[in-house]
Amino acid sequence: MISRISVTTSPPKIFRLLYFEKSLHFNNYCRIIYYDNASVEGVMFMGESRHIYRCAVIGQAPMRFPWGFDEEDSGCRKMKIELAQQVMALRQRGVTQFLTACDCGVGLYAAEIVNGLRETTDPDLMLFCYIPHEEQATKWAPYLRERYFTMLEKCTHISVVCPVGTPDAQLQAYRKIIDLADVVLCVHDTDLSATDSGENRAFAFAVESHTPTLVLHPKELTAEWVGEQFYPRRS
C-alpha cells in the first residue's frame, strides 16, 4: 500500500519514499514517489527509463449542468459513462496517473471511476487527490461528504494545496493539477456564457498553458481537442 502524505505547507525540497511490492503484471519493481520543488510525483520501474503520463480531470460545477446534482438523471448517467470511456481511452494511450482537485462534481465522478478501475481491472492505475484545503467538504451534503472521504481512503496519494481560508483555493488546486499534467480532460460546455468561476478560469489556464486539453461536452457527449493533441512519447 502506498503511504499517503497530507501537507498544508510546501513539501521539503526533495523527499523520496522507496518500497518494493509484487505486481500481478510485472516482476518485482521499485516504485518511487518523489517530491521536488514543483511537488511532482511519479513512478518509475526498476531498470526502465519510463516516462510517467499524468492526466488532470476538471469540469464545470454541477449546478451548471441541466440536471444539477441529480446523478440519477439520464443525462448525468450518460455523461458519467462517456467520462469513464475517455478515462479508459487515455489509459490506453499511456496515462497511468489521474489527478483531481476534489470538487463535488466532475472531480468526484472521475475519482470514483478511477478507483473503480483500480479495484477491478487495473491495479497499476493511480489516483492523486489534491485537496484545496482541509475543510473542503465541511459544508457538503452528507451523501457527498461520505463519498468524498471514501475517495480519499481509496486513492493513491493525498496532498493539501492551501491552508484553510485561502482565497480561490479551489482554483489553486485546479492550477496545481494542470501544472503537473501532460494532458487535461475537461467536462465543459463551451456554449455557456463565460463566467468568472474557478472552473472556467481553470479551463482557460489549461488552454493558455498549451497543455493538450480534451473537452467532453456534457450534453452532446462529443469529445474534441483544444489546441494540440496528446501524443505520448515512446521510450
Predicted regions and their residues:
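Cationic, amphipathic, low-complexity segments that mediate targeting or membrane/lipid association
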Residues: 6-12, 17-18
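Compositionally biased amphipathic helical and low-complexity segments enriched in hydrophobic
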Residues: 18-19, 25, 66, 217
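Short, positively charged and aromatic/hydrophobic N-terminal segments
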Residues: 19, 25-39
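Residues at secondary-structure transition points
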Residues: 10-13, 36-37, 65
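Acidic/glycine-enriched connector segments
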Residues: 45-234
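Intrinsic disorder/low-complexity segments enriched in polar/small residues
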Residues: 14, 20-23, 42, 49
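Detector for intrinsically disordered, low-structure N-terminal pre-sequences
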Residues: 6, 39-42
